Swiss-Prot record:
The keyword Transmembrane does not apply. Negatively regulates transcription of bacterial ribonucleotide reductase nrd genes and operons by binding to NrdR-boxes. Keywords: ATP-binding, DNA-binding, Metal-binding, Nucleotide-binding, Repressor, Transcription, Transcription regulation, Zinc, Zinc-finger. Residues 1-26 are annotated as: Disordered. The lineage of its organism: Bacteria, Bacillati, Bacillota, Bacilli, Lactobacillales. One of its GO terms (molecular function) is DNA binding. A zinc finger (unnamed) spans 3-34. Pfam families: ATP-cone, Zn_ribbon_NrdR. Residues 17-26 have a biased composition (Basic and acidic residues). The keyword Metal-binding applies. Residues 49-139 form the ATP-cone domain. This is Transcriptional repressor NrdR. Its cofactor is Zn(2+).
């Protein structure tokens, strides 16, 4: 494993433990050249999934793409990277549990939106505004009304 700081190829594992999702091993490493400490994650290599986009093009499934999209939506919000990592793990697990090797981008986007609605409403709205490509303020307004109705129902329960 190359050191992200100096590029050295020799590192030793200081700590190794199972991550919260149960499917990943978290390893704490130390570079033998510069003593920089960094974290790596090890997980089982899964079958290749293909995402079919709205325009019909296909690309390989990327959990990093989901993670980065959520990170952008959650900027300056009280959402930790651990919460986002757990959310992405749940989404990936749902996608991989599907029997199909091809998954629509709509299916993935809806999974992300469902998870974000539970995590943080502002992050949800930010993600939705990009994902759904709102044409005007009216579309955004109707989404906000749906969220408001959902919040009222939760408070009544």
């Amino acid at each position: 494993m190359r050191c992200p700081k100096c590029g050295g190829s020799k590192s030793s594992v200081i700590d190794s433990r199972q991550a919260e999702d149960g499917n990943t091993i978290r390893r704490r490493r130390e570079c033998e050249d510069c003593q920089h400490r960094f974290t790596t994650y090890e997980r089982v290599e899964e079958r290749t999934l293909v995402v079919v986009k709205k325009d019909g093009t296909r690309e390989q499934f990327s959990r990093d793409k989901i993670f980065n999209g959520i990170i952008r939506s959650a900027q300056k919000r009280p959402v930790s990277s651990d919460e986002i990592e757990a959310l992405v793990n749940r989404i990936e697990q749902k996608v991989r549990s599907s029997s199909d090797n091809e998954i629509s981008s709509d299916f993935i986007g809806n999974l992300v939106m469902d998870e974000l609605a539970e995590l943080d409403e502002i992050t949800y709205v930010r993600f939705a505004s990009v994902y759904r490509s709102f044409k005007d303020v009216g579309e955004l307004e109707s989404l906000l009304q749906q969220i408001t109705k959902g919040v009222k129902k939760k408070r009544e329960e």
